[in-house]
Each structure stands twice: as C-alpha cells, then as structure tokens.
C-alpha cells in the first residue's frame, strides 16, 4: 500500500508543478486537490507503517 501511495504522490506532485507553473492553468485546481489528498494518504500510510513495527514492505 505504501508503494502505491508513493507512486500516486509522485504523480500528484508532477501534476501540481504543472498546474502551479501556469502550463496547465485550467487543471491547477484539480492538481491542488489531488496533491493534498495524496499528501494526507501518504501521512496516514506512514503513521500506519510506523505503528505496525518491523514488517517487510
């Protein structure tokens, strides 16, 4: 699960960079939403991983 969160976080970061940079101005709002959703998912996944202990990825 952590792998997918990292993949989608990377996609969201790229989309956010393009959206915030003015290249895709119409998609900036969507990129911001996706970016923040995946930041939250990443944080949740990280906390769950830390609480589980030393299990393999």
Swiss-Prot record:
Alphabetic keyword roster: Cell membrane, Membrane, Transmembrane, Transmembrane helix
Keyword Flavoprotein among record annotations: no
Signal peptide: none
Membrane-topology annotation of the record: Multi-pass membrane protein
Major location (coarse): membrane
Transmembrane stretches, start-end: 4-24, 28-48
Pfam families: DUF1328
Taxonomy, superkingdom: Bacteria
Family: Belongs to the UPF0391 family.
NCBIfam families xref list: PRK13682.1-1, PRK13682.1-3, PRK13682.1-4
Protein name: UPF0391 membrane protein IL0696
């Amino acid at each position: 699960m952590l792998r997918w969160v990292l993949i989608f976080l990377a996609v969201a970061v790229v989309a956010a960079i393009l959206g915030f940079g003015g290249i895709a101005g119409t998609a900036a709002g969507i990129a911001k939403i996706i970016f923040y959703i995946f930041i939250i998912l990443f944080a949740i996944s990280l906390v769950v991983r830390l609480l589980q202990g030393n299990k393999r990825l």
